[in-house]
């Protein structure tokens, strides 16, 4: 697992912490410390979704957005599934190999209006 992420210009540390388990959570976002802590006992299959959820928590916190936790959970779970189902596209975007939006090339520029 990665040890840090840049989220909206700030570096956040990513770690595992037993204290997350004692709170009954799989992950925690600690905004005052710029930390995301993940449960060391969660299944590997859960790690990506939980990390993405905590990233959403950090973004919402940094932007001061009021968002119900259930809606944040739905958004993060949905985006995680899109990313998993389309891993090739997301790895290409991350490698700057594929622009997110492809615009058609202009073959000629109109010089007058119709």
Protein language model annotation of sequence segments:
Residues 1-46, 62-114:
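Metalloprotease/metallohydrolase-associated module, dominated by Zn2+-dependent proteases
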Residues 49-61:
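Active-site recognition of the HExxH zinc-binding catalytic motif
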């Amino acid at each position: 697992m990665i040890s840090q992420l840049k989220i909206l210009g700030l570096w956040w540390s990513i770690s595992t912490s037993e204290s997350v388990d004692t709170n009954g959570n799989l992950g925690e976002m600690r905004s005052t410390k710029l930390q995301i802590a993940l449960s060391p006992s969660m299944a590997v299959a859960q790690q990506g979704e939980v990390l993405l959820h905590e990233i959403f928590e950090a973004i919402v916190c940094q932007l001061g957005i009021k968002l119900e936790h259930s809606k944040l959970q739905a958004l993060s779970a949905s985006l995680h599934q899109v990313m998993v189902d389309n891993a090739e596209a997301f790895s290409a975007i991350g490698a700057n190999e594929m622009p997110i939006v492809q615009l058609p090339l202009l073959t000629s520029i109109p010089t007058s209006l119709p």
